[in-house]
């Protein structure tokens, strides 16, 4: 029999079944009573009653178990299950039960119905396939009988990092309920199923059978027979293709107008492209565009960028993180998820600028100066060497930098008559040797620069340098300041002047003089610069009476050519006055008196052994030697 009231009961409810003997019995172990409950019979364990005539078995109704009039399975349904049932004397009890449905059977004594609705299967009307973000899948839950639904029950689905819910949409009053699941970004599973046997949730609603009994919501274990995973082969791909890196198959270097740079965009999965997506590139005042050319069906897409003349950048990168544009095309994965086109931040890791060192250079280099005659940037107009020549210059390039300089040498501005264009690598000076340059001829050095992108500067030519290998020609040199003199009375000073020196090329820049006691000598005064003066007064000398002194002069031109030395005919130091003679008062004889207003005098015997007598002077006084 049963102490449970007659009525209908559902899965999870407890029905107390009692077995009554004709005397008190002692029970050991766990007896079992097998009940007839449909496809799966319930085996109910002994609960209590030892020492009495009535034993109790608590039957908890299981999922899928049902019976229109609960009874045990057969007359042998009561089993010892390794236990014992004996009376006080130790006699084993007879376990044979009344025939099910007959007098004293459970079915005859009670009217207990096991009827609650339960889930028999979970499936989907969607075809076995892979589904993308935004796709809507109907999930069907099939009960063993019609059920009525209120509110919005739901099923929790196993969809990767974040589990999603399928929400009830229809089916109340039928045995099949439909739930709707919309694939969200990030959802992923290789075989869609619910999360657990308790994944079907009322969510404040109800699911009941026709009698109003709450349905059993327990589902088959995920992957087991009757589960969604076992019934269907549905793949969820909610992974959005994203850009992992931007680079280029073009070698690092500098490029200019007309060159093509191939930009590569790598995604985290294969993508399919339609149309012609584009990438906006940061290329200075005018931005460039790279257009899609190939790669559909793979992880890497290639874009061609044709460089325009207005484009310049020292490190090619795209314009911004949103520089990749569909341009009316599409970029999707195999199931149709639209790719996220966000690029790494410009200059950051995995950006084009970070991965590559590509310069776009359409700015020609600039040569700022060309100097002939020196390697240090100093420009000269003349030089005395006809076999060597130094050239120096300066240049710059604002974008890619100078790759090489070239120079040429000619007899005309920009000409190459002497040296055709020769590479100087990146040096900014060169020293030429082994030349055969012509005297009084002007030579012009020209320089041009090529940057790393191949842009060539304008040719810049120096102002020229003239070869001067001819010394100045000499003129004449005279002793004295006013015509040529042969004697001097000064013991400390000599004078000289010269004229007629010439240099037709670089011009005279300095005169030097020397003084010696022989022609061309310098024993009295060593060679001394007189700048451009053509007269000289030399003081602080110590001249010797009777010694002849010679002044020598030479000229130097701008490049250092020195003329021949030309020397005066000499000037003799006459430091001693003439030897005195005799002076007479009178013209013929020496007188003592005169009686007139005229005085006459005469002299004789005056001599000078060096320069000779030039003139006589006289004076008159009231006493000897006076001039009053």
Where are these predicted regions, by residue range?
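Extracellular fibronectin type III
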Residues: 454-467, 559-575
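Conserved aromatic anchor
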Residues: 387-398, 492-504, 597-609
């Amino acid at each position: 029999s049963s102490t449970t009231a007659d009525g209908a009961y559902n899965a999870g409810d407890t029905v107390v079944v009692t077995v009554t003997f004709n005397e008190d019995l002692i029970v050991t172990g766990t007896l079992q009573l097998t009940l007839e409950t449909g496809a799966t019979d319930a085996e109910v364990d002994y609960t209590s009653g030892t020492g009495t005539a009535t034993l109790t078995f608590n039957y908890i109704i299981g999922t899928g178990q049902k019976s229109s009039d609960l009874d045990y399975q057969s007359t042998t349904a009561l089993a010892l299950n390794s236990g014992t049932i004996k009376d006080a004397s130790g006699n084993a009890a007879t376990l044979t039960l009344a025939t099910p449905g007959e007098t004293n059977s459970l079915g005859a004594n009670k009217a207990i119905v096991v009827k609650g609705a339960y889930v028999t299967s979970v499936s989907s009307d969607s075809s076995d396939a892979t589904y993308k973000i935004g796709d809507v899948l109907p999930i069907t839950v099939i009960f063993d009988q019609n059920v009525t639904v209120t509110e919005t029950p739901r099923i929790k689905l196993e969809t990767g990092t974040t589990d999603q819910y399928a929400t009830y949409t229809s089916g109340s009053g039928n045995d099949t309920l439909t739930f709707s699941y919309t694939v969200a970004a990030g959802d992923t599973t290789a075989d869609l199923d619910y999360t657990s046997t308790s994944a079907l949730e009322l969510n404040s609603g109800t699911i009941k059978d026709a009698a109003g009994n709450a349905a059993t919501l327990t589902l088959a274990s995920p992957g087991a027979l009757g589960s969604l995973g076992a019934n269907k082969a549905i793949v969820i791909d909610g992974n959005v293709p994203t850009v992992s890196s931007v680079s280029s198959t073009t070698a690092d270097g500098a490029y200019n107008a007309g060159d093509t740079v191939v930009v590569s965009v790598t995604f985290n999965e294969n993508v399919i492209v339609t149309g012609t997506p584009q990438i906006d590139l940061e290329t200075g005042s005018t931005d460039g565009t790279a257009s899609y050319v190939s790669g559909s069906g793979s992880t890497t897409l290639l874009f061609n960028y044709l460089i325009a003349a207005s484009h310049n950048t020292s490190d090619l990168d795209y314009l911004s993180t949103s520089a990749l544009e569909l341009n009316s095309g599409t970029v999707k994965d195999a199931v149709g998820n639209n790719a996220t086109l966000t690029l790494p931040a410009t200059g950051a890791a995995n950006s084009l600028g970070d991965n590559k060192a590509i310069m776009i250079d359409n700015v020609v280099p600039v040569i700022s100066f060309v100097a002939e005659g020196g390697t240090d940037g100093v420009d000269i107009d003349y030089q005395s060497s006809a076999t060597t020549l130094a050239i120096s210059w300066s240049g710059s390039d604002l974008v890619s930098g100078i790759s090489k300089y070239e120079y040429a040498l000619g007899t005309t501005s920009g000409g190459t008559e002497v040296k055709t264009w020769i590479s100087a690598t990146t040096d900014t000076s060169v020293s030429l040797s082994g030349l055969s340059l012509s005297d009084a001829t002007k030579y012009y050095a020209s320089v041009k620069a090529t940057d790393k992108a191949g842009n060539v500067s304008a040719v810049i030519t120096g102002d020229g340098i003239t070869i001067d290998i001819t010394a100045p020609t000499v003129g004449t040199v005279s002793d004295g300041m006013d015509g040529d003199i042969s004697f001097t009375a000064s013991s400390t000073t000599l004078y000289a002047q010269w004229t007629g020196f010439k240099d037709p090329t670089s011009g005279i820049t300095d005169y030097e003089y020397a003084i010696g006691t022989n022609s061309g000598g310098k024993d009295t005064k060593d060679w001394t610069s007189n700048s451009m003066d053509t007269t000289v007064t030399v003081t602080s000398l110590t001249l010797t009476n009777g010694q002849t002194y010679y002044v020598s002069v030479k000229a130097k031109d701008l490049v250092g050519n020195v003329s021949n030395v030309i020397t005066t005919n000499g000037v003799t130091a006459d430091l001693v006055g003439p030897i005195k003679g005799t002076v007479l008062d009178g013209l013929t004889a020496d007188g003592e008196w005169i009686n007139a207003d005229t005085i006459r005098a005469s002299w004789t015997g005056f001599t000078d052994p060096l320069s000779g007598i030039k003139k006589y002077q006289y004076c008159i006084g009231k006493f000897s030697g006076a001039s009053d």
